[in-house]
From Swiss-Prot:
Protein source organism: Citrobacter freundii
Name listed for the protein in its UniProt record: D-galactose/methyl-galactoside binding periplasmic protein MglB
Domain remark text: The calcium-binding site is structurally similar to that of EF-hand proteins, but is in two parts, with the last calcium ligand provided by Glu-228.
SUPFAM superfamilies: Periplasmic binding protein-like I
Positions of the record's site feature: Interacts with membrane-bound trg signal transducer: 97
Family: Belongs to the bacterial solute-binding protein 2 family.
Signal peptide annotation: 1-23
Lineage: Bacteria, Pseudomonadati, Pseudomonadota, Gammaproteobacteria, Enterobacterales
Main subcellular location: periplasm
InterPro entries per the UniProt record, alphabetical: Bact_Solute-Bind_Prot2, MglB-like_PBP1, Peripla_BP_I, SBP_2_dom
Gene for this chain: mglB
Residues engaged in binding Ca(2+): 157, 159, 161, 163, 165, 228
Sites where the protein binds beta-D-galactose: 37, 114, 175, 177, 181, 234, 259, 279
Main function: Part of the ABC transporter complex MglABC involved in galactose/methyl galactoside import. In addition, binds D-galactose and D-glucose and plays a role in the chemotaxis towards these two sugars by interacting with the Trg chemoreceptor.
Compartments where located: Periplasm
Keywords: Calcium, Chemotaxis, Metal-binding, Periplasm, Signal, Sugar transport, Transport
């Protein structure tokens, strides 16, 4: 009787191992540069939601905690676990070459997302792709929004000099999105014939608390009453600026962000923010998951999808959001 029990146990264990092995055939390793980034939190949850609709896929999720060395170690572990594809949100875009060499060693395809690797890095591996946005587009659209509202609100021009006196909260220095948004928002305004004067510019590293501190310092400085527009590279920093302005009883100063986070959309609705730019987290997540799953299954990256791949890159478009079209992006 004991032998029969042991034999049955062995068979069941074998079946369970087989099921686990089968599940491992569609394992996809994912790293997020840090879980507590507002925007990447939305992307992460959207990827997890997409994966739930594909029961044959098992995601192995990792929080890299803004540490590239930690992320490299996580990738080593994922490869050791036999993942069939990697979806990597780099901590440092300059580390793409190192990550690619790890993946190449196991012949594992890789989809980078949100933080764009260099062209050289992407071209170095035939199984490397990128999902993201055209960084300069977000700056251009933000500039268009500011120009639209500047024209509609002549009272914003506090000193009546026809020039926008602005402060700008910048994201991570060197990050492609931060650099492009900072450059192109002002370029677009100037291209439209609007003169600008920078009163302050500093990094707040995409972070609400840091942005609040920066804005608070500016509102306590000599230019406090000259600020006509606040420009932020993302909504998290815009929200920090809103908090600081409220504390200084300056809620009439318009604030513009990027991402169209739910919290920011609520601020646009209330008037605390003048506008934002939709950084389409759901479609970036879906494209990342679709490409990674196809590659894990040995298919072409875009097979059976509507994604357009150009030079190994999927670009998800941005959309400007203000009160005029807010309803399109809420209650979904």
């Amino acid at each position: 009787m004991n032998k029969k029990v042991l034999t049955l146990s062995a068979v069941m264990a074998s079946m369970l191992f087989g099921a686990a092995a089968h599940a491992a055939d569609t394992r996809i390793g994912v790293t997020i540069y840090k879980y507590d980034d507002n925007f990447m939190s939305v992307v992460r949850k959207a990827i997890e939601k997409d994966a739930k609709a594909a029961p044959d896929v098992q995601l192995l999720m990792n929080d890299s905690q803004n540490d590239q060395s930690k992320q490299n170690d996580q990738i080593d572990v994922l490869l050791a676990k036999g993942v069939k594809a990697l979806a990597i949100n780099l901590v440092d875009p300059a580390a793409a070459g190192t990550v690619i060499e790890k993946a190449r060693g196991q012949n594992v395809p890789i989809v980078f997302f949100n933080k764009e690797p260099s062209r050289k890095a992407l071209d170095s591996y035939d199984k490397a792709y990128y999902v993201g946005t055209d960084s300069k587009e977000s700056g251009i659209i933000q500039g268009d929004l500011i120009a639209k509202h500047w024209a509609a609100n002549p009272n914003w021009d506090l000193n009546k000099d026809g020039k926008i006196q602005f402060v700008l909260l910048k994201g991570e220095p060197g990050h492609p999105d931060a650099e492009a948004r900072t450059t192109y928002v002002i370029k677009e305004l100037n291209d439209k014939g609007i003169k600008t004067e920078q009163l302050q510019l500093d990094t707040a590293m995409w972070d609400t608390a840091q942005a609040k501190d920066k804005m608070d310092a500016w509102m306590s400085g000599p230019n406090a009453n000259k600020i006509e527009v606040v420009i932020a590279n993302n909504d998290a920093m815009a929200m920090g600026a809103v908090e600081a302005l409220k504390a200084h009883n300056k809620t009439s100063v318009p604030v513009f962000g990027v991402d169209a986070l739910p919290e920011a959309l609520a601020l646009v609705k209330s008037g605390a923010m003048a506008g934002t730019v939709l950084n389409d987290a759901n479609n970036q997540a879906k494209a990342t998951f679709d490409l990674a799953k196809n590659l894990a299954d040995g298919k072409g990256a875009a097979d059976g999808t509507n994604w357009k791949i150009e030079n190994k890159i999927v670009r998800v478009p941005y959309v400007g959001v203000d009160k005029d079209n807010l309803a399109e992006f809420t209650n979904k």
